[in-house]
Amino acid sequence: MASSLLFSFNNPNCTHPSIDELPLPKYNNPTKPNNVVLHRNKPFLMPRTTMERRSQFICSASSVLISPEELEDDESDQEETLVFDEDLDTRREDTRPLSQVWREIQGSNDWEGLLDPMNSHLRREIIRYGELAQACYDSFDFDPHSKYCGTCKYQGSEFFEKLEMAHLGYQTSRYLYATSNINLPNFFQHSRLSKVWSTYANWMGYVAVLTDEEEIKRLGRRDIVIAWRGTVTYLEWIYDLKDILHPANFGDDPSIKIEAGFHDLYTKKEDNCHFCSFSAREQILSEVKRLLDYYRGEEISITVTGHSLGAALAIISAYDIAEMKVNVMRDGSSGKMTTVPITVYSFAGPRVGNLKFKERCDELGVKVLRVVNVHDKVPTVPGIIANEKMQFQKYLEDTISFPWSYAHVGVELELDHTHSPFLKSTIDPSYAHNLEAHIHLVDGYHGKGRKFRLVTKRDIALVNKNCNFLKPEYGVPPNWRQDENKGMVRNSDGRWVVPERRIIDGHPPDTAHHLQQALNVATDDGMGGGFPLEAI
């Protein structure tokens, strides 16, 4: 029965689905552009009817182009690859304004009734935050031949513009750094040159705030986003994990523990390095406190996103903000305490802490939506011995303090890359882990047992940015994203050189002040969990 539902790729008379057959999403305002589309060029896909048509394709960084003559497809020849539900109406839209339902979309009810079938608002928000996480990869200098390896290639003031993401309406408020002087050697990137920008530091992501008034109105609030860099393809960092739980020490309960490598990455600092003089934790607490004070009185949300190891840091930092009560604000006029909601969009993330950590996140109201591919191995570690799927996990932790017990936090959105007709079969584990592939799967997911069908018209060429996951008949070369001439420019002597960067954004001068303010919040009125600045 199941086999009859599958499309046969070996049949030469069959063709792949045309992008023009995919239904257009409905909008309340048809003149308003789709704000979640990173590349606004319309993607065209290659029919499989004649292999000679490949030569007519020109691949660029933004789209795959096909001549107008090729757009005349015979609809009778176009079939969907996977057919699970013939009654699926992919044109169904949530007609409520996002500004009215944003708390629900951000997980106030743990996404109940929004994932199956997939809510149209939620789909676009997952994609939007996935792209904000992907920006960490697209802007990171991976080149070991550059003395700037390990930095962000763009200054904060031009970050979103350089990445063609200015339409999202965010502005970076600070960059995040971490010391590489910890036991995760396969995660950090270092230059092979002797003279480098920093011996210890690696750029880890950014904090940004929504400043565009139209977007604030559309979303219904001012959004503060924290995006963490992970690992775009290489999975060697997994082998660096010691599978040792370390007390979080962000609150009063020593039984709340997180994986030791993640803890070190988040809390360690290097006094001799300008970029690592504050730990990643201190940078986060300081900046979130500063922004919340600055925008006091407004409707605000805090959204944290990350992929792979970055997803682990996203959950840890969200928990930390809530545990330290930095998101609890007192209204200046009424004196009423309000709590800013915290949401995490995690992509392909590992387990972070023990069951007590998971339970404490739930108590604090930290909402986590974990987007995973069932074929990806990263979400299965650490915690192979004892995890949330075990019936007796709580007994192991409470009775014998079992040291290798881990539990996932939040709600899981389970995807399967074999359901996409655009992706090829592969045994390469990095493909199943790829962030762009996850975003692609979200675009076509409609619920369990429903056929895969793209909705937002997001360019499928983006999948092959850093891998070779698309089927070859779509004419998109692998690993196509790179800077022009790999960043080399001609100097005044006519020689090709790596251009100097005048400024590498470091820590704002008021970091220590706002950090101390954040720590004071945790100790005021008996709210608990605070630390003096010198002890953090």
Report residues per predicted region:
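Serine hydrolase/lipase
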Residues: 2-125, 222, 258, 264, ...
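General structural concept
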Residues: 112, 116-118, 123, 143, ...
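Structured beta-strand/turn binding interfaces of compact recognition modules in eukaryotic regulators
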Residues: 123, 129-138, 157, 208-212, ...
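Alpha-helical bundle cores of large, well-folded domains in eukaryotic cytoskeletal
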Residues: 129-131, 142-151, 159, 163-170, ...
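Terminal and linker regions of secretory-pathway proteins
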Residues: 130, 140, 147-158, 388, ...
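A conserved cap/lid and substrate-binding interface adjacent to the catalytic center
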Residues: 167-169, 173-305, 324-336, 341, ...
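Catalytic nucleophile loop
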Residues: 311
